[in-house]
Regions:
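Short, hydrophobic/aromatic alpha-helical segments in well-folded domains
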Residues: 19-23, 38-39, 51-52
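Beta-strand elements of modular eukaryotic interaction domains
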Residues: 25-26, 34, 107-109
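Surface-exposed beta-strand-to-loop junctions
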Residues: 2, 32-33, 131-134
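Active-site-proximal specificity loops/subdomain of glycosyltransferases
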Residues: 1-31
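C-terminal helix/juxtamembrane-tail motif
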Residues: 194-214
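Short beta-strand-to-loop acidic/aromatic patch adjacent to the donor-nucleotide binding site
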Residues: 30-45
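Catalytic core and acceptor-binding pocket of nucleotide-sugar-dependent glycosyltransferases
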Residues: 42-193
Length: 214
């Protein structure tokens, strides 16, 4: 794992486990219906001139993202086999959206919504079914033994429980986290640095698959 980003970081593993399931239990968050995860050091390239939470509510959306990309294979080797066994044990019927995250052989295709930008309803993760799933995953210690990220964990559950109509791609928001950016072609509201390379249709982006998925 030393060749993988954060592959030897215990602190990063703590963070991924925290955001996968524990953060919703914090008492300061108990009175809120929606949240928007914003990390330090990120850039927003567009003026956001509307209430994203109200928009989500008005349009019956439960989860929102700006970047979808492939996960590093070594970090999630056992995540899908364990998830598949969980679904079998609990006799959970998958929503059609789960197929977005699977290849033609029924295995995880590594696509996920990048959760450093995540607008969602708390109810997704407060659902007893999700807490049961998180507890099940946690027993396998994959957050530490492999470096499971909260992004693939959240994404798989979104695929299991939601329909595509409940998930929103914020196409009107330009954003950068670390070395990955997305730019919006709206000169009156958005300004992307010349150095930024739009990740939307990069070979490791899953956006094209999302836009084509029915």
């Amino acid at each position: 794992m030393s060749q993988v980003k954060y592959g030897t970081s215990v602190a990063y593993r703590h963070m991924c486990r925290w955001f996968s399931g524990l953060f919703v239990m914090h008492p300061l968050l108990s009175g809120y219906e929606f949240y928007w995860r914003v990390e330090p050091g990120v850039d927003f390239y567009c003026k956001i001139n509307y209430d994203v939470f109200q928009w989500m509510e008005d349009n019956n959306k439960s989860y929102g993202f700006v970047i979808s990309l492939l996960e590093l294979p070594k970090t999630v080797t056992s995540l899908w086999p364990i998830t598949r066994e969980y679904l079998k044990q609990r006799r959970i019927t998958n929503s059609t959206l789960l197929n977005f995250f699977l290849n033609d052989y029924g295995n995880y295709n590594l696509c996920h919504f990048w959760s450093n930008f995540e607008i969602a309803r708390f109810s997704i993760w407060r659902d007893p079914a999700y807490l049961d799933y998180f507890t099940y995953l946690d027993r396998w210690d994959g957050f530490y033994l492999e470096r499971w990220g909260d992004a693939p964990v959240h994404s798989l559950w979104v695929g299991i429980r939601l329909n595509k109509s409940q998930v929103h791609f914020f196409h009107d928001i330009g954003y950068r986290h670390d070395t990955i950016s997305r730019c919006v072609n709206d000169g009156s509201r958005c300004k992307c640095p010349k150095s930024a390379i739009n990740f939307d249709f990069h070979k490791d982006s899953c956006l094209a698959r999302w836009l084509e998925y029915k």
